[in-house]
């Protein structure tokens, strides 16, 4: 074994799982472990899994198998670690009995305990080698900020609460400290994430915390205002994801539209509507008044005309009729959602939706998903064309001889569109990764933009 023990790491799943991985890696580095980029260079391997849908389960099981084959010493964590097999035993231990240990999600302490058992930590922790912002797996100029864990909802298609538990909000001072450290490290964009961002603080009855001597309620609106104030000091962006459409969201829109936080609290909401017909929403155990949702979307845009709304939907949910599906298509057209993703309903092991009557054939579900995306892409293309001729602020993600690739306030990394920026023709217009630049938009397709500095 090398002088400093080395741990390999495989991170799968969503941004929330990515943050879990970042926290584990940060703790490993704080205790003096080195992170190996290869299996054969590691003394053991940690695999952070996803267990949300069947494809993710198989991907995670395959990754564990590969790590066992290539290295032999594997610790497993993440959502799949909390899943049982048909026999009632732990699924991972049943499929891969040679793993050293298995934990559930957001279990940094348990993972570290397992690492210590099989690979004792070095005597010198090298704390000074770990940046205050922690170890990040994202590019240096943007980072995810997880404000809570778990969810109090029991949507029939979802098993997240059974794996990640009920809502647990992080103390507001802890969140603000992490945000400040990230901005100090050079992060230009914070992406606020959780299972349910709008519910932040519900579990602690919105108790008051303190940050730099100032009281801040453990509540979404108050946290967003505090993050906006902090972001303004660093000329940075704050972007909100996984915003459940509670009435409290109405209070956040003005922060995006006016005042000192405009341009820092981005006019962007990621709101998982899932459907628009009240009967389908009722079967999903989601808010079931689509007319009021449409009114609220229109009101949001009256207050903040630049607002970008991203959402996700499920087509072909059990019992969904053609008429109900057409209602969903009408909603997409009327709400003019900017960015939309859609999944054909897929049964998830353990979800109560599996017990609902009216399961639709695979070809019907997939056909409806395709029809949905055709309408959604048409709406998105119409909205994006309106940006041609405008000058927009762009955060540069990549630079090459062919020019740059960046994103506007309307585009989150990896899931939305990008701006292809022409190479700088003058020294005064040169840019690098992490720079904000003003770009005149010269062209657009259904998803992306083109422009010049």
Swiss-Prot record:
Its EC number is 2.8.4.4. Its main location: cytoplasm. Gene3D superfamilies: Methylthiotransferase, N-terminal domain, Nucleic acid-binding proteins, tm_1862 like domain. CDD domains: Radical_SAM (cd01335). One of its GO terms (biological process) is tRNA modification. Residues 385-453 form the TRAM domain. SUPFAM superfamilies: Radical SAM enzymes (SSF102114). [4Fe-4S] cluster 2 binds at residues 151, 155, 158. Residues 5-120 form the MTTase N-terminal domain. Pfam families: Radical_SAM, TRAM_2, UPF0004. Binds 2 [4Fe-4S] clusters. One cluster is coordinated with 3 cysteines and an exchangeable S-adenosyl-L-methionine. It catalyses: L-aspartate(89)-[ribosomal protein uS12]-hydrogen + (sulfur carrier)-SH + AH2 + 2 S-adenosyl-L-methionine = 3-methylsulfanyl-L-aspartate(89)-[ribosomal protein uS12]-hydrogen + (sulfur carrier)-H + 5'-deoxyadenosine + L-methionine + A + S-adenosyl-L-homocysteine + 2 H(+). SMART domains: Elp3. [4Fe-4S] cluster 1 binds at residues 14, 50, 79. One of its GO terms (cellular component) is cytosol. GO terms for molecular function: 4 iron, 4 sulfur cluster binding; aspartic acid methylthiotransferase activity; metal ion binding; protein methylthiotransferase activity. It is found in: Cytoplasm. Residues 137-382 form the Radical SAM core domain. Keywords: 4Fe-4S, Cytoplasm, Iron, Iron-sulfur, Metal-binding, S-adenosyl-L-methionine, Transferase. Its cofactor is [4Fe-4S] cluster. Catalyzes the methylthiolation of an aspartic acid residue of ribosomal protein uS12. HAMAP family: MTTase_RimO. Belongs to the methylthiotransferase family. RimO subfamily. PANTHER family: RIBOSOMAL PROTEIN S12 METHYLTHIOTRANSFERASE RIMO, RIBOSOMAL PROTEIN US12 METHYLTHIOTRANSFERASE RIMO. This is Ribosomal protein uS12 methylthiotransferase RimO. It comes from Burkholderia ambifaria (strain MC40-6).
